[in-house]
């Protein structure tokens, strides 16, 4: 044992073994860590009832899924709808469903039936999970003074623990290309004091005119007012949960305005996109020292002729690097793409991809040129100093 620091562990059911050998286990563990089973209804309460003097931490909680840019209005449970390899044939959903926290469907009928063509992608409405939503998990963590916190699984998407044709699962709140998913902004609304509003989904839904789309907002403001094409759909007070509007789709602009003490303090908006026309390049830095190990990260969006991002675009892009720069890798965040990271081309996923560069030993101007079929070519200059 370590006399200087509290000792913990992550366990599927850490109370097993304590029931008959409590004192021995307590000699080694100061804080009891709960993995997946800690997400189930009544599990943590049962622990606290039996061991009221011990504190706990959720070491692998919650397990929720999202694929960036993908939405489904009806709830999906992993064990029922997309079982992991080790669950296939081993789990009877009817016997398991009473142990999960309910996540109501957002609509009676699926708003995005076309997404059924992509069974390895999960919805970004916080309605694809193993046992509990991210929202409910945090509410529960906050309500138990003897529960120190939670470490969600996972923070980033990661290679492995997935079945062909996937290279990674969809556990993260940031995808494998380091692009935030919607859940990232849920946690931001819970943990930051800076006023913020996040709106989902995007507002490019061709063929769905007049059909009801669930619009979800995360915020830390007092209230949010929603607008479609500058017409107010009303405001709703924030009470610690997500805000939901059911909105008949009409192309144009959707905007959420966060209000504190009667003033607009944060906004978020989307504009309906037309056909892909060009690319937009955004770099984390525009100058770098020669021979540096710094990484230049360039996020690329497919845009229409008005510069509006195209959220369904899947154009193939090619990258040419000249001057004192070299290509480190490319990625698009798609969990089912198996391309080599070092190749100088990439198919965008849900309108985006990322290019990573690094400087050579020489000084001068380096250039990244991005090209795509029927797209306007773009160049980005990086000063190597």
Language model features with spans:
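Low-complexity, acidic Ser/Thr/Pro/Gly-rich terminal tails and inter-domain linkers that flank the onset
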Residues: 273-291
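Extracellular Ig-like/FN3 beta-sandwich strand-entry sites
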Residues: 249-253, 295, 363-365
């Amino acid at each position: 044992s370590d006399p200087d620091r509290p000792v913990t562990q992550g366990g599927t059911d850490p109370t097993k073994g304590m029931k008959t050998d409590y004192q021995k286990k307590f000699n080694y563990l100061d804080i009891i860590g709960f993995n997946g089973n800690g997400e189930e209804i009544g599990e943590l309460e049962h622990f606290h009832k039996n061991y009221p003097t011990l504190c706990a931490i959720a070491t692998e909680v919650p397990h929720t899924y999202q694929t960036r840019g993908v939405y489904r209005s009806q709830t999906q449970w992993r064990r029922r709808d997309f079982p992991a390899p080790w669950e296939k044939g081993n789990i009877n959903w009817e016997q398991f469903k009473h142990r999960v926290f309910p996540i109501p469907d957002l609509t009676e009928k699926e708003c995005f039936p076309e997404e059924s063509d992509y069974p390895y992608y999960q919805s970004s409405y916080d309605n694809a999970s193993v046992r509990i939503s991210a929202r409910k998990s945090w509410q529960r963590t906050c309500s138990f003074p003897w529960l120190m916190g939670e470490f969600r699984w996972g923070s980033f998407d990661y290679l492995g623990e997935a079945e062909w044709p996937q290279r990674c699962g969809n556990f993260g709140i940031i995808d494998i290309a380091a692009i935030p998913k919607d859940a990232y902004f849920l946690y931001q609304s819970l943990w930051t004091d800076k006023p913020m509003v996040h709106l989902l989904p995007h507002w490019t839904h061709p063929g769905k005119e007049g059909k009801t789309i669930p619009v979800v907002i995360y915020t830390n403001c007092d209230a949010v007012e929603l607008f479609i094409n500058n017409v107010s759909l009303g405001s709703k007070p924030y009470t610690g949960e997500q805000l939901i509007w059911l909105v008949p789709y009409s192309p144009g602009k959707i905007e959420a305005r966060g209000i504190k003490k009667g003033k607009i303090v944060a906004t978020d908006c989307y504009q309906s996109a037309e056909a892909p026309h060009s690319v937009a390049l955004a770099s984390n830095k525009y100058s770098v020292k020669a021979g540096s190990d710094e990484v230049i990260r360039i996020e690329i969006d497919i845009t229409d002729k008005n510069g509006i991002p195209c959220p369904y675009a899947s154009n193939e892009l090619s990258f040419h690097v000249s001057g004192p720069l070299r290509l480190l890798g490319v990625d698009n965040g798609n969990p089912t793409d198996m391309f080599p990271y070092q190749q100088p081309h990439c198919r965008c996923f849900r309108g985006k991809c990322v290019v990573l560069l690094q400087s050579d030993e020489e000084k001068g101007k380096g250039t990244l040129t991005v090209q795509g079929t029927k797209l306007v070519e773009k160049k980005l200059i990086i000063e190597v100093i």
